[in-house]
Amino acid sequence: MFGYVIPNQAALDDEAKARYRTAYCGLCRRIGALHGLRGRLTLSYDLTFLDLLLSSLYEGESECVTGSGHCPIHPIRKINWRHSGPTDYCADMSVALHYYNAADKWNDDRSLLGLGFEKLLDSPAQTAAQRWPRQCSAIRTCLDRLAQLEAEGSEDLDAVSGCFGELMAKLFDYKQDHWSPELRSIGFHLGKFIYLLDAYDDLARDEKKGAYNPLRTLSRQPGYEEEMREIFELLLARCARSFERLPCVEDADLLRNILYSGVWLKYNCKQAKETPKK
């Protein structure tokens, strides 16, 4: 369930593209500094969005460090990067999320890939849990509850998506301060959107494999596509409403690009593939 919170590159100018890339590379750099090369395997667009959001909201509360250099992914060409205080938090959350997700894949599906990834990230995840016990405990609790609902074959969309929404709400609540209500709202509705879009995207594959998907029954009902579109629009509207209440200035246009356009890219791509050509 990663890789949905992405920028719409086609709608960004060169400066905005460069700023996104420096944030993405800055997060990768901090993951590597805190958790080594194996930690870099957890780099995602989703946590880059959280880093951009928190760095913008808490701009000025910590130094923004910039630089350029080589890395294992770019050993020849120098790349520019930037990071601030929230970046280290996002680096830890990136490792923790992927660790617990891998553990669930092993426990639920006996996925050897999940087991291998869990073992690989065990030490970094424990380090992250020591620094952020509240958030890491929430990840574990929410994923356990979600796994139980999925094992029961639940098709209560609000319940199953709400588990992942609650997880994301806890992650977005960085400092438990006066911005917490809006941050939790963004995380909650974005998390529900991610979970349901992932189920929507995987439906045909899951049906072919006989795997669990909460949309299986609903997908056979008249008006399924229209209902899913309405659900996605409602969740993102609530997410955007909470974002607009935050005093974000730095990278605000980049954040809006992601929230208003980028998050729709995979949905639009699926629609384009399924629309018959005239």
Where are these regions (language model features)?
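Acidic catalytic motifs of isoprenoid enzymes
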Residues: 1-185, 192, 196-233, 241-251, ...
